[in-house]
């Protein structure tokens, strides 16, 4: 077994640390936390929505389906697009969609409006996640595991 110092090869662990932008990673982490907490709000208020709109379990399932379809199906498409054409402003745009969905949910008077609100929150998630992943990777300084955690 050869000691790395004998071969003259010294791994540059400090170089990666110096290039890691912890302030950007912190901002992305806080934004991601807020984004995911807001999305979880929909699940948490199912009992309130059921009581307010006299929803059946099927209708509650439709709320989940609407959110999941927009969040899951749009995200890879948006990711493909932003890989080729980075959109740094998509982070606040994604959060704006999520905010719009939550605000619409707060004033919803009919079930279709609740579905639209869920779709807006899902769209916000699908826009936010690809770009936040890209920004975290760029700020990682080569420490991709750290950036994604």
Description of each model-found segment:
Residues 2-31, 35-36:
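Cytosolic juxtamembrane N-terminal segment immediately preceding the first transmembrane helix
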Residues 68-69:
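Short hydrophobic/small-residue motifs within alpha-helical transmembrane segments
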Residues 56-64:
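Juxtamembrane helix-start elements in MFS-like secondary transporters
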Residues 28, 110-118:
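Short hydrophobic/alpha-helical segments at membrane-entry points of transmembrane helices
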Residues 24-57, 78:
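Extracytoplasmic
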Residues 31, 63-64, 117, 147:
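Hydrophobic positions within alpha-helical transmembrane segments
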Residues 72-112:
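Conserved MFS/SLC helix-loop-helix module at the cytosolic interface between two early adjacent transmembrane helices
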Residues 117-149:
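Cytoplasmic helix-loop-helix junction between adjacent transmembrane helices
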């Amino acid at each position: 077994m050869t000691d790395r110092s004998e071969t003259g090869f010294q791994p540059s662990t400090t170089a990666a640390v110096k290039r890691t932008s912890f302030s950007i990673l912190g901002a992305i982490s806080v934004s991601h936390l807020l984004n995911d907490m807001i999305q979880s709000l929909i699940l948490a208020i199912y009992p309130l929505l059921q009581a307010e709109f006299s929803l059946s379990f099927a209708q509650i399932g439709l709320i989940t389906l609407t959110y999941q379809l927009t969040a899951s199906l749009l995200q890879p498409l948006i990711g493909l697009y932003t890989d080729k054409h980075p959109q740094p402003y998509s982070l606040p745009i994604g959060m704006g969609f999520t905010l719009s969905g939550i605000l619409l949910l707060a004033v919803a008077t009919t079930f279709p409006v609740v579905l639209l609100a869920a779709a807006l929150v899902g769209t916000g998630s699908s826009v936010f996640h690809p770009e936040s992943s890209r920004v975290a990777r760029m700020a990682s300084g080569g420490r991709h595991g750290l950036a994604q955690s």
